UniProtKB/Swiss-Prot annotation:
SMART domains: EFG_C, EFG_IV. Belongs to the TRAFAC class translation factor GTPase superfamily. Classic translation factor GTPase family. EF-G/EF-2 subfamily. PROSITE patterns: G_TR_1, G_TR_2. One of its GO terms (molecular function) is GTPase activity. It comes from the Bacteria. The lineage of its organism: Bacteria, Bacillati, Actinomycetota, Actinomycetes, Bifidobacteriales. This is Elongation factor G. Residues 10-295 form the tr-type G domain. The keyword Disulfide bond does not apply. The gene is fusA. InterPro entries: EFG_II (IPR041095), EFG_III (IPR009022), EFG_III/V (IPR035647), EFG_IV (IPR047872), EFG_V (IPR035649), EFG_V-like (IPR000640), EFTu-like_2 (IPR004161), G_TR_CS (IPR031157). GTP binds at residues 19-26, 91-95, 145-148. It is found in: Cytoplasm. GO terms for cellular component: cytoplasm.
């Protein structure tokens, strides 16, 4: 069935739903789809029936792994109901192992709904996702969910937005009742209350608009006047009017909130309970009222693929040439490769040719769909400002730019963190070998943080990713989707190596004379350490003057150095944090070649590296443990014994919160130990923080193990 697509971009919203794991993100999305008329029956996550969680593993585990995209339509309910809006939603995972899914979704969104747990407020993963949204400049509204939960506290949650995120909350609603008595919300703009009646067959579709309950009037007045103080300052005229009349119209308040939200100066806060069907419709109204349309977002800026110094911008209109960014790839049993794109300008039809400017290759668009979770709705064209799925593209990968062949542009690609954990996998039978290679190639195509490599010495296949859960799911998908049975080794930490000292004027000459044409390349190079804590991985600088090395050979030196860095210095782990500068060298008219200079670059690094004070780096995790007070001493003692350093201790509702930094190698099996120390009453989350130098005693053990001693 073909979908309507609204052509007026003012009425389109591209949004993401983002949160900490278990804050109720997928349930919130399910309710949105139900109330916008996309679903006829609500799917419950805990029953394994959720629409957005369509992979078998997601249904079993009740978590969201891949960001599903869907399109729905909405007419406001709390005011001006005649205008129809199109909302393209991406539901993103909250689990730390799936940060790539979150990163790539945020890159193509115009706005987001941040969902918080009404009892916990801002949690570690909410902070991570919030920072990712800051990085991509995504305006947000906040939805404090689970207001029916025991211990839910709206005002505490709002305070954590201020304190932990350093953000300015704009409270536009107050809850009516809490925990079991939560029945609705007060709208501080209209000064009305929306109350839901618990009639099961209604599923929260209807609510009553009533006067504010007496016991909340005073508090509502106080919060409204704070809201007016905040919004009046956006505009001098507005401030004057507010000071004169002591009030502003609903339209003026909404306009000012929209302005503050789009500028990311403040974040509207709403509340509800998605699971209990309360508060979702006013939140949808807030999505269209406050989050930007593609027209409110600045033009996308890219550069000329043939000259990176030339900036090009594309406006979100049909008149500008076609440009789009690939933000996700997945495999479909029938269509093969599904390529998810955000179209920034122009349009494209099925059958059109486009240029993949990242790879410099032409591609032909087969079919174009708008997705509803895992169902495809064909459309006649992909137009500026919307999100689509293309079929028929052959060599495209995540982060590629697609554009008009006659008007090429390259958009900024996406950066993904390096994997921190790896396991060896081997097929159970010879017949599985080829199937496994094919499956791993397809799966690594889908997820940029999942990598596959073959250990040259042992011949083993190593898969690496952001955490144990991610790798479990990959192995599970190989079994289910590709029918590959394999044995899995124990998880290993993805160590890195770096240098601490500069080595200057390292010289290397590669010379081979064997009848016929020989090989010759001479290089003089400097190798200096970079700041790995700031994510500086590698830099190559060409300072050769006077044509001592011809331009065509310079990239080969660079490639040679990078190849040598891959195989390590001390223990065979990839080297990071190196600035390589080629300062001089020599060529031979006949015997010099790209290969000769690649070997020279590689050998120059290999000879310099042992003199550059090499060290091993290990991934350090930011760990947060929430524990009842009586187990605090045991938990801290245990973290210290794992080479952890305690960063802070705080109080949260009924528990103590310990923040620590602990090496990943010490965290395997931690969940079982924590449960036994606290009788199952403590919980923890961890996420990648940084790489740090391994203490010498530990480094010696690692080197011995790598050498098989």
């Amino acid at each position: 069935m073909a979908l309507d697509v609204l052509t007026n971009l003012n009425q389109v919203r591209n949004i993401g739903i983002m949160a900490h794991i278990d804050a109720g993100k997928t349930t919130t999305t399910e309710r949105i789809l139900f109330y916008t008329g996309k679903n006829y029956k609500i799917g419950e996550t805990h029953e394994g029936a959720s629409t957005m969680d369509f992979m078998a593993q997601e249904k079993e585990r009740g978590i969201t792994i891949q960001s599903a995209a869907t399109t729905c339509f909405w007419n406001r309910q709390t005011h001006d109901p005649d205008e129809k809006f199109q909302i393209n939603i991406i539901d993103t995972p909250g689990h730390v192992d799936f940060t790539a899914e979150v990163e790539r979704s945020l890159r193509v969104l115009d706005g987001a709904v941040a969902v918080f747990d009404g009892k916990e407020g801002v949690e570690p993963q909410s902070e991570t996702v919030w920072r990712q949204a800051d990085k991509y400049g995504v305006p947000r509204i906040c939805f404090i969910n689970k207001m029916d939960k025991l211990g839910a506290d709206f005002y505490y949650s709002v305070s954590t937005i201020k304190e932990k995120l350093g953000a300015t909350p704009l409270v536009v609603q107050l809850p009516i009742g809490a925990e079991n008595d939560f029945s609705g919300v007060v709208d501080l703009i209209r000064m009305k209350a929306y109350v839901w009646n618990d009639i099961k067959d209604d599923q929260g579709a209807h609510y009553d608009t009533v006067e504010i309950p007496d016991d909340l009037k005073e508090r509502a007045e106080q919060y409204r006047s704070e809201l007016l103080d905040q919004v009046a300052e956006t505009d001098e005229e507005l401030l004057e009017k507010y000071l004169e009349n002591g009030d502003l119209s609903e339209q003026e308040i909404r306009g000012a909130i929209r302005q503050l939200t789009i500028a990311r100066e403040a974040y509207p806060v709403l509340c509800g309970s998605a699971f209990k069907d309360k508060g979702v419709q006013p939140m949808l109204d807030a999505v269209v009222d406050y989050l930007p349309s593609p027209e409110d977002v600045p033009s996308i800026v890219g550069f000329d693929p043939s000259d990176e110094s030339v900036e090009i911008d594309r406006k979100p209109t049909m008149d500008d040439p076609f440009s789009a960014l690939v933000f996700k790839i997945s495999t479909h049993p029938f269509y093969g490769k599904l390529v998810f794109v955000r179209v920034y300008s122009g349009s494209v039809k099925p059958g059109d040719n486009v240029l993949d400017s990242t790879k410099g290759k032409k591609e032909r668009v087969g079919k174009i769909f708008q997705m509803h979770a895992d169902k495809e709705n064909p459309v006649d064209a992909a137009e500026a400002g919307n999100i689509y799925t293309f079929v028929g593209l052959k060599n495209v990968t995540t982060g590629d730019t697609l554009c008009d062949e006659k008007h090429p542009i390259s958009l900024e690609s996406m950066t993904f963190p390096d994997p921190v954990i790896e396991v060896a996998v081997e097929p159970k039978t010879k017949a599985d070998q080829e199937k496994m290679s094919l499956a791993l190639a397809k799966l690594s195509d889908e997820d940029p943080t999942f990598q596959v490599k073959t250990d040259e010495e042992s011949g083993q296949t190593l898969i690496s990713g952001m955490g144990e859960l991610q790798l479990d799911i990959i192995v599970d998908r190989m079994r289910r989707e590709f029918k590959v049975e394999c044995n899995v080794g124990k998880p290993q930490v993805a160590y890195r190596e770096t240098i601490r000292k500069a080595v200057m004027n390292q010289e290397y000459t590669h010379k081979k004379q064997t009848g016929g044409s020989g090989q010759f390349a001479k290089v003089l190079m400097n190798f200096e350490p970079l700041d790995t804590e700031n994510g500086e991985v590698y830099e190559f600088v060409n300072e050769v003057t006077g044509g001592h090395i011809t331009k065509e050979f310079i990239p080969s030196i660079d490639a040679g150095v990078q190849e040598a860095m891959e195989s390590g210095i001390l223990a065979g782990f990839p080297v990071v944090g190196v600035k390589a500068t080629v300062t001089d060298g020599q060529v031979h008219d006949v015997d010099s070649s790209e290969m000769a200079f690649k070997i020279a670059g590689s050998m120059c690094f290999k000879e310099a590296a042992p003199k550059a004070k090499p060290v091993i780096l290990e991934p350090i995790m930011a760990v947060e443990v929430r524990t009842p007070e009586e187990y605090m001493g045991d938990v801290m003692g245990d973290l210290n014994s794992r080479r952890g350093s305690i960063q802070s201790m705080n109080d949260a509702t009924g528990v103590k919160v310990i923040d620590a930094k602990v090496p990943l190698s010490e965290m395997f099996g931690y969940i079982g130990d924590l449960r036994s120390k606290t009788q199952g009453r403590a919980m923890f989350t961890m996420q990648m923080d940084s790489y740090a130098e391994v203490p010498k005693a530990v480094a010696d053990e690692i080197i011995k193990a790598q050498r098989g001693e």
